[in-house]
Amino acid sequence: MTIQISLTQFLTFKAFVSTNAKYNYILKQKNNDGYHPSHDYWKNFREAIHRLPYNNGDLTVLYDAVDMVKPEKKANYTKSVNNFINFVSDNDVTFFEVGKAKWNFENELVINASPDIGMIIDGKKYFVKVFPNVQQKKSRLDSKSVKSILTLLQETNANFNTSSGTFAVLRVNSPRFFKAEAIKERDSKLLKIDAANFVNCWEAV
């Protein structure tokens, strides 16, 4: 049976250094009953971003997301919302709808990797994956991890015309906008090695 996971799950697995940590993470995922909204910290933030192409880019929906979350989340949500809005304002961004995309590794592993939103910046179209996470040392979204993400995004099977724009990653905290470049053979091979490692660990647990 093909393993189906989210991009976040794959990145979390990759971030663990020790085999023991990877084992425990896979065990937790296999024992999990599946997705539940209460376990999705950034659900309200992402849903607000998804609405932007349909409300003429009205950013007030992001403040609505802050109002909806529990008190213990408000500080992180407020920081991410303010950083996202500052990025949009500084770059005169307009939004458009994007479709779905998945990355398939030898029909053994499928990773859901749909862009969160389409952005037009300086007349250029970008299919953007947004990472609002408050950065911690053990899971920091650095240039190395972003390169792997962008390689995966470019190799996805998408239901929209990917040749009309460029894949990109927006790191919301410690803000930075990463644009995809031509895929390097080495990066593609490293990605497949990580995927094979995930499959092997999954099957061994």
Language model features by range: what are they?
Residues 101-106:
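Flexible, glycine/threonine-enriched loop-and-boundary segments that flank and lead into catalytic domains
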Residues 121-182:
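Nucleic-acid nuclease catalytic cores
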Residues 36, 40, 72-75, 144, ...:
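Alpha-helix boundary/N-cap detector
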Residues 166-205:
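Domain-level recognition of nuclease-like catalytic cores that cleave nucleotide substrates
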Residues 68-99:
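Acidic-basic catalytic patches of nuclease active cores, encompassing PD-(D/E)XK
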Residues 108-112, 116-128:
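Active-site beta-strand-loop-beta-strand hairpin of nuclease catalytic cores
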Residues 1-71:
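A structured, charge-rich N-terminal accessory region that forms the first stable segment of a protein
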Residues 54-56, 152-163, 193, 197-200:
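Structural alpha-beta junctions
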